[in-house]
């Protein structure tokens, strides 16, 4: 049985997926972004589900798709071809509110908190390994001084 844990914003749970290739990517309901990943021999799989966060996909220095610019009231799944075939090469936490995932061929995915839309302490992403949900990353609660 896989244990589900909730963590403050950290790249450690993503690191085991470094080197995996994006096999499929799409936007689901609302702004949910899903990346299906696998090793080159497809023996290990992973999934990153960007859940309650804003995001932008950058390729060669230009924004190619963003949660803020999606068509409203769409009912169909929207493919994200810009990441398919690329390998996840790094994950970086910029601060307590932003995470960057780097991909081969000069692409990256920026993920950041939107407290207005999703509230404080929202779930940033869910990580799955070999079909099992393993980790939920949450934005940390703001500290009160």
Spans of model-derived segments:
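Surface-exposed, interaction-prone regions used to assemble/regulate multi-protein complexes
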Residues: 1-145
């Amino acid at each position: 049985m896989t244990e589900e844990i909730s963590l403050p914003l950290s790249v450690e749970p993503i690191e085991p997926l470094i080197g995996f290739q994006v096999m499929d990517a799409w936007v689901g309901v609302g702004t949910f972004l899903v990346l299906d990943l696998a090793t080159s021999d497809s023996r290990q799989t992973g999934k990153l589900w960007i859940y309650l966060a804003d995001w932008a996909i950058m390729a060669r220095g230009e924004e190619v798709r963003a949660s803020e610019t999606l068509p409203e009231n769409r009912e169909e799944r929207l493919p994200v071809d810009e990441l398919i075939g690329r390998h996840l090469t790094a994950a970086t936490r910029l601060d307590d509110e932003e995470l960057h995932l780097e991909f081969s061929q000069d692409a990256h995915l920026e993920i950041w908190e939107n407290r207005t839309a999703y509230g404080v302490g929202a779930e940033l992403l869910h990580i799955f390994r070999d079909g099992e949900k393993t980790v939920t990353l949450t934005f940390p609660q703001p500290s009160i001084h």
